[in-house]
Amino acid sequence: VNVGCVPKKVMWNTAVHSEFIHDHVDYGFQNCKSKFNWHVIKEKRDAYVSRLNNIYQNNLTKSHIEVIHGYATFRDGPQPTAEVNGKKFTAPHILIATGGVPTVPHENQIPGASLGITSDGFFQLEDLPSRSVIVGAGYIAVEIAGILSALGSKTSLMIRHDKVLRSFDSLISSNCTEELENAGGVEVLTVKKFSQVKEVKKTSSGLELHVVTALPGRKPTVTTIPDVDCLLWAIGRDPNSKGLNLNKLGIQTDDKGHILVDEFQNTNVKGVYAVGDVCGKALLTPVAIAAGRKLAHRLFEGKEDSRLDYDNIPTVVFSHPPIGTVGLTEDEAVHKYGKDNVKIYSTAFTPMYHAVTTRKTKCVMKMVCANKEEKVVGIHMQGIGCDEMLQGFAVAVKMGATKADFDNRVAIHPTSSEELVTLR
């Protein structure tokens, strides 16, 4: 709520407004130039977050739940014990839901790395940076680069390989990279491929970045990016498990510190559970909420088999345009079912919104089907409205719908979503 999906969506909505302003003239509106005021949206965004926090606090109070502010750490004892502010607490059930934290390079890896900020720091910016450099190729990097550039910050996205979102389906990875590069026509955005920041220095005019670019088959080159107002690391997230003294209870973790749990969110210590990003699986707020709810049903309502099914969890990337994806990628489906048992349906088109606009974005869609019955095991799309249209299609995938089920629906015309029920 504070530094995650809620304020991010507010900023994405703001960036979308900026994009639409560029299209107003094409739709017949004159004199639509408008100066963006960062302070106005920051104040409104922060007030919205504050209202939500008050609502959550009121709900906790009404439910007679005591909130203790502080940092918990586990202590030795005959039963699992947590200490907060010098006071010890124990209970038959202890849940660890501490989430994750942004990864920041060590100073011995990249001198001056601490001069940069993370996605948490993005929400503390008091002004729109004039010059921004985002390091990373995941969804957080893509989203923040899109927001800043759309709002007028000259932005560079630094990626180590040739594409962003490389864990997504190849269609999405390629198209999103292409859309980012094409965005330079409206926003001020460049994608620097095969590039890494090697050193950061503070100067009188901002930050100075020393960048190494190593294109395949070519000798690495070193360049300097001066006058950077905002260097943002979006290179991954670490589990927020340091300082918990998990070893005091013998709670098992992986090499990165993620807490190991079974399908019912149990750790290896009886009465201690973990959900959410601290477990390192499906790092999404709704996943943590759903897993916590299922755990509560099991522990307090006697539903012994209550657990979250982690298959076919839908997710959206608030890029420009947005991405929606659920299920297996094409490569994952081939690995699971075999190449001969996988059939792909795909399409690419220009959304009707752009029929009269100079600015263009594409909409791409892919349906991954498996076996003779052509069960739909994956849907991947990027385009205007894909963020909102995914939820319903995700229900169909979860229910085991086939390609024939999609074909038997009457299309809603004219929409982009109709393409998924008319694929050939």
Swiss-Prot record:
One of its GO terms (molecular function) is flavin adenine dinucleotide binding. FAD binds at K8, A72, D277, T285, H413. The keyword Acyltransferase does not apply. It catalyses: 2 glutathione + NADP(+) = glutathione disulfide + NADPH + H(+). It is found in: Mitochondrion; Cytoplasm. Its cofactor is FAD. GO terms for biological process: cell redox homeostasis; cellular response to oxidative stress; glutathione metabolic process; response to activity; response to cadmium ion; response to ethanol; response to iron(III) ion; response to ischemia. It comes from the Eukaryota. Its EC number is 1.8.1.7. Its main location: mitochondrion. Keywords: Cytoplasm, Disulfide bond, FAD, Flavoprotein, Mitochondrion, NADP, Oxidoreductase, Redox-active center. NADP(+) binds at A137, I140, E143, R160, R166, G236, L283, V316. Binds 1 FAD per subunit. Glutathione binds at Y56, R293. The keyword Disulfide bond applies. Catalyzes the reduction of glutathione disulfide (GSSG) to reduced glutathione (GSH). Constitutes the major mechanism to maintain a high GSH:GSSG ratio in the cytosol. Homodimer; disulfide-linked. Belongs to the class-I pyridine nucleotide-disulfide oxidoreductase family. This is Glutathione reductase.
